[in-house]
Amino acid sequence: MNCFELDTISHSYDRETVPKDVTLQLNSGEILGLFGHNGAGKTTTIKLILGLMKPSAGRLSVLGGEAGDPKVSQHIGYLPENVMFYPQLTGREILAHFARLKGASPAQVPELLAQVGLADAMDARTRTYSKGMRQRLGLAQALLGKPRLLMLDEPTVGLDPVATADLYRLLRQLRDEGTGIVLCSHVLPGVEPYIDRAAILTAGALQAVGDLPSLRRQANMPVTLDLTSAGDVGELENTVNAATRGRETVLRRDGQQLSVDIDPHEKMPVLQELLASGAIADLSIHQPSLEDLYVHFIGAGGLAHRGGAQ
């Protein structure tokens, strides 16, 4: 069953339409990365799915029902970008309060707080919490009642690298248990191994959607071969030039190493010729990363291949 289906959804306000004509779905047991620059329409799309806004055009179905229906909403967990809590209450008290509001069992509160790494701070007032701790408390609140759909808007904001890795491991566990998860972010480094598909928005339009292999096929960006010479690097360079003659490539030299950017469809015949030459001591192959694909699809330009989006 799909967690949600957007069919040519648009939302217009102040003479702007964001998102516009977006068609997208999320399956149960799937993590979808929703990426785009600030103002691309990520948060508005989430609010449409939550029923906090109404689409101007298109069709929207959430968990087989209508967005905003209380019977649907009780199966959704949501972590907003900026979380705020009553500073005089403890983490345990706040989570118990939200459990009652959602109709979830308060008995799960200690377990959820431990799950997000707040076991030792559950009885401390939240005014003493760091930003990262408040973010983890917000995640625990989103997990109340074992939601079937989990919406996370910039969930790694304020988290250190260890806490971020813990978050991604938890999301994988929830996915394996059947939860559909939307991970909304403009920060790409580190997220690539943890998502099943990526959707890239710019100016409200969906530029691309798919798993990484399909996005790479759509982009048809070059792969990079890093080659270490078994002897004289000049001889290796001559061998590479011979193997790639007539093909569109970019060759770079750094000490005993050569890097070759080449069309992915030309990769195997060139590799076979290079390996047969005996001129290579070592090699590695780098495919376009999620960051590279993001830059390609939004058309930003100016970022070197294998560089990073900030």
Task: Locate each region found by the language model.
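C-terminal coupling/interaction segments
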Residues: 263-310
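Residues at or immediately flanking beta-strands
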Residues: 59, 224, 282-284
